[in-house]
């Protein structure tokens, strides 16, 4: 795992097309903004896991 330190307003790049910007820090919460092409899905981990679980629950055709 790569660990980076960023301040509010600073950005990191993921590949050529995705940026992650630190928008704010309040207590133990960090607000981030993600810019990515439409074809790149961006989800919180718990939402992604729920989507994957629901895909697994669907009957096969």
UniProtKB/Swiss-Prot annotation:
Keywords, comma-separated and alphabetical: Activator, Cytoplasm, Repressor, RNA-binding, Translation regulation
InterPro entries in the cross-refs: CsrA (IPR003751), CsrA_sf (IPR036107)
Coiled coil: none
Molecular-function GO terms, alphabetical: mRNA 5'-UTR binding
Entry GO CC: cytosol
One BP term from GO: negative regulation of translational initiation
Entry keyword Lyase: no
Subcellular location: Cytoplasm
Main subcellular location of this protein, as a coarse class: cytoplasm
Highest taxon of source: Bacteria
RNA-binding among keywords: yes
Subunit structure: Homodimer; the beta-strands of each monomer intercalate to form a hydrophobic core, while the alpha-helices form wings that extend away from the core.
Cross-referenced NCBIfam families: csrA, PRK01712.1
Entry function: A key translational regulator that binds mRNA to regulate translation initiation and/or mRNA stability. Mediates global changes in gene expression, shifting from rapid growth to stress survival by linking envelope stress, the stringent response and the catabolite repression systems. Usually binds in the 5'-UTR; binding at or near the Shine-Dalgarno sequence prevents ribosome-binding, repressing translation, binding elsewhere in the 5'-UTR can activate translation and/or stabilize the mRNA. Its function is antagonized by small RNA(s).
Similarity remark: Belongs to the CsrA/RsmA family.
Listed name of the protein: Translational regulator CsrA
């Amino acid at each position: 795992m790569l660990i980076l330190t960023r301040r509010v307003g600073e950005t990191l790049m993921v590949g050529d097309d995705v940026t992650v910007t630190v928008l704010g820090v309040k207590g133990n919460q960090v607000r981030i903004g993600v810019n990515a092409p439409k074809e790149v899905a961006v989800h919180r981990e718990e939402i992604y896991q729920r989507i994957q679980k629901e895909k697994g629950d669907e009957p096969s055709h």
